[in-house]
């Protein structure tokens, strides 16, 4: 049996009794035209090791393999799907490996040891999508050449937002300090089974050249959590907590970064937050010298 001879996904769900679990944030994308579009966003995968989180019954899984990925590692917590995924593995000629476990705990680099670039493609579970993105952005060095990720539309907007946008915040600053990010596809709720209450969207992230990547993600997280946690306050007030953790004052950080203490976080560009993170790190390290 080949991939195009596999039974329709609805039949697979029925025969294996694979109803979606709300506790896992599961919403299945069954439209094979849409899954093919998503898989193609990864580009040529003929020499790549792909990874997918939360494959479920295997809609996107089939598309990734059909688009020619050299191999695919699927990380799935829900053991109910293992039988359906094994059928896909057989149909793909043994190119699929399934790792049962929590994707937040999995060390992908220990599992993806073969040749070729690594690429991430996932319809991310709604309840852990942001955490997984931060995990992958924190990796040093970034081990993947591209990530094609589906989020709730609200989260996708936050990843690609620009200064002044309503959605601009911590996620945009951290993502765009490490990658180029753009919104590639909008997916209506009706495309899923069961349909979620919100729309979804696919974001494509390409790591910036090594020299342009901001490395100190921990400092950037501290600064952005503080600044956007009180986004209606001026930076002088919103940065007070983070500054105290670094053993300095908000005014000192802002002066070092060349920023106006009366501004709010929403108008500060990516470079400005990186300057604040550098100033915070310098103060933090000096206090422990």
UniProtKB/Swiss-Prot annotation:
Signal peptide: none annotated. GO terms for cellular component: cytosol. It catalyses: adenosine(1518)/adenosine(1519) in 16S rRNA + 4 S-adenosyl-L-methionine = N(6)-dimethyladenosine(1518)/N(6)-dimethyladenosine(1519) in 16S rRNA + 4 S-adenosyl-L-homocysteine + 4 H(+). Keywords: Cytoplasm, Methyltransferase, RNA-binding, rRNA processing, S-adenosyl-L-methionine, Transferase. It is found in: Cytoplasm. Its EC number is 2.1.1.182. GO terms for molecular function: 16S rRNA (adenine(1518)-N(6)/adenine(1519)-N(6))-dimethyltransferase activity; RNA binding. Gene3D superfamilies: Ribosomal RNA adenine dimethylase-like, domain 2, Vaccinia Virus protein VP39. Belongs to the class I-like SAM-binding methyltransferase superfamily. rRNA adenine N(6)-methyltransferase family. RsmA subfamily. Specifically dimethylates two adjacent adenosines (A1518 and A1519) in the loop of a conserved hairpin near the 3'-end of 16S rRNA in the 30S particle. May play a critical role in biogenesis of 30S subunits. This is Ribosomal RNA small subunit methyltransferase A. It comes from Maricaulis maris (strain MCS10).
């Amino acid at each position: 049996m080949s991939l195009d001879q596999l039974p329709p996904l609805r039949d697979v769900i029925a025969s294996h009794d694979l109803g979606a679990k709300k506790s896992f944030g599961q919403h299945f994308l069954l439209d094979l035209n849409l899954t093919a579009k998503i898989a193609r966003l990864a580009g040529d995968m003929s020499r790549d090791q792909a990874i997918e989180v939360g494959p479920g019954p295997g809609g996107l899984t089939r598309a990734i393999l059909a688009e020619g990925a050299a191999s695919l590692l699927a990380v799935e917590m829900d053991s109910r799907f293992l039988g359906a995924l094994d059928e896909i593995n057989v149909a793909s000629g043994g190119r699929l490996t399934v790792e049962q476990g929590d994707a937040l705990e999995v060390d992908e680099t220990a599992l993806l040891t073969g040749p070729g670039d690594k690429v991430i493609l996932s319809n991310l579970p709604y309840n852990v999508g942001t955490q997984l993105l931060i995990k992958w952005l924190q990796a040093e060095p970034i081990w993947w050449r591209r990530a094609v990720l589906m989020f709730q539309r609200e989260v996708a907007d936050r990843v690609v937002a620009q200064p002044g946008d309503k959605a601009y915040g911590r996620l945009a600053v951290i993502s765009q300090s490490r990658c180029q990010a753009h919104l590639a596809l909008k997916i209506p709720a009706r495309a899923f089974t069961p349909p979620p209450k919100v729309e979804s969207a696919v974001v494509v992230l390409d790591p910036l050249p090594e020299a342009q990547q901001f490395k100190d993600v921990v400092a950037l997280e501290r600064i952005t959590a503080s600044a956007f946690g009180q986004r209606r306050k001026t930076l002088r007030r919103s940065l007070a907590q983070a500054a105290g953790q670094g053993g300095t004052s908000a005014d000192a950080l802002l002066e070092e970064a060349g920023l106006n203490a009366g501004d709010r976080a929403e108008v500060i560009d990516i470079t400005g937050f990186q300057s604040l993170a550098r100033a915070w790190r310098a103060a933090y390290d000096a206090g422990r010298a």
